[in-house]
Structure formats: structure tokens, C-alpha cells
């Protein structure tokens, strides 16, 4: 069943006109999972509740986000695709029986919804980083090529497993190591990204000014 759901997700993803995503390193996936739990109020040892996060936490960070619960009788996306996230509409769509079972704590359905929640969170992160032009947080942006989307689905599975079972994020690490890996290093990268962006913009502005002055000088000499 999980394999069928996975294949159905790939087929759906490659149809998206805006199926762009962040391609993360292993450290990036760990960082995403750690901060996902932190911002969702789970900390390092709390229980991650994807339905609660979808309904209450994500809207706090992204006002454009929405979700839809569709009755099984009206579900036209195939038998095996039980839920999906569409980045173009910024919406999670879930079949109602899957939603109800997830509320009841059925593990497979909890994982299914958690997977889509992680997709949404990755989309939020991507839009934020694109807006800040902080490219150090990502290794590449991939289009809706089927092989690339397959990699993205595997990446999302990995982050989802870390979000639901976070022991490996902090296991064997001291408090100082956790602070360094998940707080200090990302902050340094973020600040460096901002400085690089500011410097690039300044150089472009100076070049534009020099070009403008050269044109004016040519015009003056011509007169």
C-alpha cells in the first residue's frame, strides 16, 4: 500500500506546474526536521501531531495555506493516492477516511498526513529562502522532472521519519553540540547569505551608477 501511495504521489507531483523544491544535504534534512519540531512546539522529545500542525500551526506561519478534506465518494484522484500537497494552490488535500483514521491514531494514516505536512513546510522554507536569497541553505532547485521529484519524495520521507522519530537528531550529542549544529551554524550561514546578497546588490548598484556616469560623459563630450 505504501509503495502504491508513493508511486501515485510521484505521478501527481510531475503534473504540477510549480513543482520546484529544495534539494537538501543530510545535515539540511536534520536541520529541517529539528526546526520543524521546534516551531511546532514538539521540542526534542514531544509527540508530533500532523493533523494538529496542519490545522493550527502552519496557518500561523503561512496565511495563504489551506487544506481540504474530501469525501471518499467524491475522491477522483485514484485508489492509492490518499493525500497530497499542491504547491501551486498551497493546499493539502486529504481523503476523509484517511483523515478520520489519522485522528484515531492509525499509524499509516498519521504518516501519510505527516508526509504532506512536511511537503508544505519545505515549500514554506523554500519561499522564505528565495525571498531572502539565502542560497547557502540549499544545494539546488529542481524542476518537475520525474527523477528529481523521486529524489524529493525520498527526501520528504526521510524528513518525515526524523520528525516522527527524532532520537537520532540529538542522540549522543552534548548540549553544546546541539547548540552548534542547529542554532549557531545555521545563524552564521543565514547572516553570511544576507551579507553576500547585500554586497552583490551594492556592486550592481555601483556598476549601474558607473554606466550612467559614462553615458552622461559621452553625451557631454558629443555636445
Give, region by region, the residue ranges found by the protein language model:
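A broadly conserved amphipathic alpha-helix scaffold signal in soluble, globular proteins
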Residues: 118, 158-162
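Post-HEXXH active-site segment of zinc metalloproteases
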Residues: 107, 111, 123-157
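Active-site scaffold of zinc-dependent metalloenzymes
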Residues: 70-107, 117-124
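Hydrophobic or amphipathic, alpha-helical segments that drive membrane association/targeting
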Residues: 1-78, 142, 146
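Juxtamembrane/interface and other helix-to-disorder boundary residues
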Residues: 40, 48, 87, 101, ...
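Long, well-structured alpha-helical subdomains associated
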Residues: 148-153, 161-223
Amino acid at each position: 500500500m505504501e509503495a502504491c501511495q508513493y508511486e501515485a504521489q510521484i505521478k501527481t507531483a510531475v503534473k504540477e506546474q510549480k513543482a520546484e523544491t529544495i534539494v537538501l544535504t543530510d545535515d539540511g534534512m536534520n536541520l529541517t526536521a529539528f526546526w520543524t519540531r521546534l516551531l511546532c512546539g514538539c521540542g526534542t522529545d514531544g509527540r508530533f501531531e500532523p493533523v494538529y500542525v496542519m490545522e493550527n500551526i502552519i496557518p500561523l506561519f503561512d496565511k495563504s495555506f489551506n487544506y481540504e478534506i474530501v469525501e471518499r465518494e467524491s475522491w477522483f484522484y485514484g485508489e492509492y493516492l490518499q493525500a497530497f500537497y499542491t504547491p501551486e494552490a498551497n493546499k493539502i488535500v486529504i481523503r476523509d477516511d484517511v483523515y478520520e483514521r489519522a485522528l484515531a491514531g492509525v499509524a499509516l494514516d498519521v504518516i501519510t498526513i505527516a508526509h504532506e505536512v512536511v511537503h508544505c513546510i519545505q515549500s514554506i522554507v523554500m519561499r522564505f529562502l528565495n525571498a531572502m536569497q539565502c542560497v547557502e541553505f540549499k544545494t539546488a532547485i529542481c524542476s518537475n522532472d520525474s527523477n528529481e521529484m523521486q529524489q524529493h519524495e525520498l527526501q520528504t520521507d526521510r524528513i518525515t521519519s526524523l520528525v516522527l522519530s527524532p532520537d537520532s537528531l540529538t542522540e549522543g550529542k552534548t548540549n553544546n553540540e546541539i547548540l552548534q549544529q542547529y542554532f549557531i551554524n545555521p545563524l552564521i550561514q543565514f547572516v553570511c547569505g544576507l551579507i553576500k546578497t547585500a554586497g552583490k546588490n551594492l556592486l550592481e548598484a555601483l556598476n549601474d551608477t558607473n554606466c550612467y556616469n559614462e553615458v552622461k560623459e559621452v553625451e557631454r563630450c558629443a555636445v
